[in-house]
């Protein structure tokens, strides 16, 4: 396998495993925890390989500007994600299905913690490796935005988030996009736990 093929493979693998397990396993707290754990076990060596052999995460900029840009854009995406829910037209036309379930609030606290950590620190990073590290190079900016949008039930704000994360990856580096996505998912999870707006999960 060539260096490029290896780099592409480890960029795709964590997200592919996450999606495969999501499709194949039932939507239960236990299966979500298993999916998070398996993906994390795969994600960590993939991140190490990309950084150690190719420097694709931390290239061409210092850490502090990436952190600032990532946090700012991440919080902006959070606001964009939550704010439109108040409008009937948005809930009718811009959300697939029922827009989430309220059953999560009946789950055990352990599951809530796993859900928060999995969303913030596992799937967000796996998505950035797949969409911004690999797919955007292969398919281009706008097709990546479109595919990122349809992956989410809230497709309109998903598209906006995809544009912002993609812009960060291009202008500030992949690490900045990862920090933004982690910030959004972590802050959204804390918002859900605080307010009980379980539809966002």
Model-derived regions, located:
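Short, Lys/Arg-rich, polar N-terminal cytosolic tail immediately upstream
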Residues: 1-5
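Alpha-helical transmembrane segments in multi-pass membrane proteins
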Residues: 6-53, 59-74
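N-terminal, helix-rich and Lys/Arg-enriched segments in bacterial and organellar proteins
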Residues: 9, 16-20, 87, 128, ...
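Juxtamembrane/transmembrane-helix boundary motifs at the membrane-water interface
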Residues: 19-31, 92-94, 190-201
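Structural signal for membrane-spanning alpha-helices in multi-pass inner-membrane proteins
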Residues: 22, 26, 39-50, 77, ...
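Alpha-helical transmembrane segments and their membrane-interface exit regions
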Residues: 39-48, 99, 163-175
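Juxtamembrane helix-loop-helix connectors linking adjacent transmembrane helices
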Residues: 54-124, 136-137
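Transmembrane helix-loop-helix hairpins at the membrane interface
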Residues: 104-201
């Amino acid at each position: 396998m060539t260096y490029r093929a290896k780099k592409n493979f480890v960029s795709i693998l964590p997200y592919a495993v996450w999606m495969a397990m999501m499709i194949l396993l039932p939507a239960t707290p236990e299966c979500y925890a298993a999916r998070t754990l398996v993906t994390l076990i795969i994600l960590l060596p993939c991140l190490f390989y990309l950084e150690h052999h190719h420097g694709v995460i931390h290239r061409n900029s210092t850490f502090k500007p990436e952190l600032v840009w990532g946090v700012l854009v991440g919080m902006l995406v959070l606001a964009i994600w939550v704010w439109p829910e108040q409008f009937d037209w948005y809930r009718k036309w811009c959300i697939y299905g029922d827009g989430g379930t309220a059953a999560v609030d009946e789950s055990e606290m352990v599951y809530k913690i796993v859900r928060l950590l999995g969303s913030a620190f596992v799937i967000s990073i796996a998505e950035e490796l797949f969409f911004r590290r690999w797919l955007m190079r292969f398919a281009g900016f706008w097709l990546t935005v479109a595919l990122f949008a349809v992956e989410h039930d809230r497709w309109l704000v998903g598209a906006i988030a995809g544009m912002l994360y993609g812009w960060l990856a291009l202008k500030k580096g992949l690490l900045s996009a990862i920090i933004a996505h982690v910030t959004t998912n972590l802050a959204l999870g804390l918002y859900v736990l605080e307010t009980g707006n379980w539809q966002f999960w």
